[in-house]
From Swiss-Prot:
Subunit structure: Homodimer.
Cysteines joined through disulfide linkages: none
Keyword Isomerase attached: no
Annotated organism of origin: Thermosynechococcus vestitus (strain NIES-2133 / IAM M-273 / BP-1)
PROSITE patterns for this protein: AA_TRNA_LIGASE_II (PS50862)
Recorded family membership: Belongs to the class-II aminoacyl-tRNA synthetase family.
Domain of life assignment: Bacteria
Alphabetized GO MF terms: asparagine-tRNA ligase activity; ATP binding; nucleic acid binding
GO biological process terms on file: asparaginyl-tRNA aminoacylation
Chief localization: cytoplasm
Name recorded for this polypeptide: Asparagine--tRNA ligase
Length: 462
């Protein structure tokens, strides 16, 4: 296996003879030698390769060694006289794998706007910013699995194609093989999905939660981590049509246990990234948002504040702020309300709990007051809601009534109700939008810049 530049920079010794492969970021030709900055994606920093004129003269492809070209260098590591890194490679042999015409290659040595980079999404991973984003994204995913695996959770794979709408919002992508120009019709004139591939209407999943509840009733503690889909026609910096969700589900757990786990989970992930991606986080601190390190440190170390929804409404009403959206008991909190609570009132992450039943999903447990449900949201400075969760309704009759009162057809949820017929227990869970986490971690303004291939209204390249 070839040596990666990250390992060479951290473990390479003066005098080592190595071969390294990567892509040319920059090339500078001087009187006695040529300097090439080579990057292979393993680290933000590139390896400086020094090519003596004698070696350059013996390399016919030297003129094609331009920004974007893929190349292989063999030589000896020597102490670098420069300040930026301790060692550099003095090349003795050069092999050019692939050229990049400088007249047409769009990534040159200058800053490109993120808007421009979205138009060349197949090349933007080669930039410093997107490279750093992807390494932080990888570290977040690694931390998520480590957190749950260390606590005995079972990773379960919930279906991408589903027959149920977890959120009841109706923002679903339909999956069909019917001829849309001449679909079969029912006697009432509606599309007859009984003749479709699955014999019924099917959708891309909006959440793995309901299926995770099935698994939690057998394995106690489980989690899902996979793609979800929302057909929400929102062209904003916070919305994607395809995104990843982390959704743990715990049997024999109430809302308090759910909140405690969610707080510990976020603290673990932020600490892991700070410890494992210091160079990338320093890059975001310098280039993107001067407060990302302090924010991440706060998330990793400070205990979260707690407010009931009713208390939060009182705080907002007494704030003296002229919010764009109205504040009243029974209305959902908007992003401006969430950010005020986290950034100004609590000045740290805050968990808001016990929301009005009317504004929350049917599966959330009805509290004894009959007006609120055992739901919680974790609100973070600068971004607002980062986690949403609840204790689930384990009582058959109450759940059945909630489905009906929210205007849903009980028929597709027969199996969900069955879980309450046989060995029902209190259980709880939460959901984390993975891209929202990465966006918060890195300070990136637009969520489309923290996922490799963003899916948004009017855009599904590749």
């Amino acid at each position: 296996m070839q040596q990666r530049i990250k390992d060479i920079l951290h473990q390479g010794q003066v005098g080592d003879r190595i071969t390294v492969k990567g892509w040319v970021r920059t090339k500078r030709e001087l009187k006695e030698c040529t300097f090439v900055n080579l990057n292979d994606g393993s680290t933000l920093a590139g390896l400086q390769v020094v090519i003596p004129n004698t070696v350059a003269a013996a390399t016919p492809t030297m003129k094609d060694l331009t920004t974007g070209a893929a190349a292989e260098f063999t030589g000896e590591l020597v102490r670098s006289p420069g300040k930026n890194q301790a060692i550099e490679l003095h090349a003795e042999e050069i092999h050019l794998w692939g050229t990049a015409d400088p007249e047409t290659y769009p990534l040159q040595k200058k800053r490109h706007s993120f808007e421009f980079l979205r138009t060349i999404a197949h090349l933007r991973p080669r930039t410093n910013t997107l490279g750093a984003v992807m390494r932080v994204r990888n570290a977040c995913a690694t931390a998520i699995h480590q957190f749950f695996q260390e606590r005995g959770f079972l990773w379960v794979h919930t279906p991408i194609i589903t027959a149920s709408d977890c959120e009841g919002a109706g923002e679903l992508f339909t999956v069909t093989t019917l001829d849309l120009t001449q679909p079969p019709k029912t006697p009432e004139g509606k599309i007859d999905f009984s003749q479709d591939f699955f014999g019924r209407r099917a959708y891309l999943t909006v959440s793995g939660q309901l299926e995770a509840e099935i698994m939690a009733t057998a394995f106690t503690n489980v989690y899902t981590f996979g793609p979800t889909f929302r057909a929400e026609n929102s062209n904003t910096s916070r919305h994607l049509a395809e995104f990843w969700m982390v959704e743990p589900e715990m049997a024999f757990c109430d809302l308090r246990g759910d909140m405690e786990l969610a707080e510990a989970f976020l603290q673990f992930v932020f600490r892991y990234v700070l410890d494992h991606c210091p160079e990338d986080m320093a890059f975001f601190q310098e280039r993107i948002d001067h407060s990302v390190m302090a924010t991440a440190e706060q998330m990793a170390t400070q205990p979260f504040a707690h407010l009931s929804y009713s208390e939060a409404i009182q705080v907002l009403e007494k704030s003296g702020r002229a919010f764009e959206f109205p504040v009243a008991w029974g209305l959902d909190l908007q992003s401006e309300h969430e950010r005020y609570l986290a950034e100004e009132y609590c000045q740290r992450p805050v968990i808001v709990y016990d929301y009005p039943a009317a504004i929350k999903a049917f599966y959330m447990r009805l509290n004894d007051d009959g007006k609120t449900v055992a739901a919680m949201d974790i609100l973070a400075p600068k971004i607002g809601e980062i986690i949403g969760g609840s204790q689930r309704e384990e009582r058959f009759d109450v759940l059945q009534e909630r489905i009906v009162t929210q205007g849903l057809d009980p028929a597709p949820y027969w199996w969900y109700l069955d879980l309450r017929r046989y060995g029902s227990v209190p259980h709880a869970g939460f959901g984390l939008g993975f891209e929202r986490l990465v966006q918060f971690m890195t300070g990136m303004d637009n969520i489309r810049d923290v996922i490799p291939f963003p899916r948004t209204p009017g855009n599904a390249e590749f």
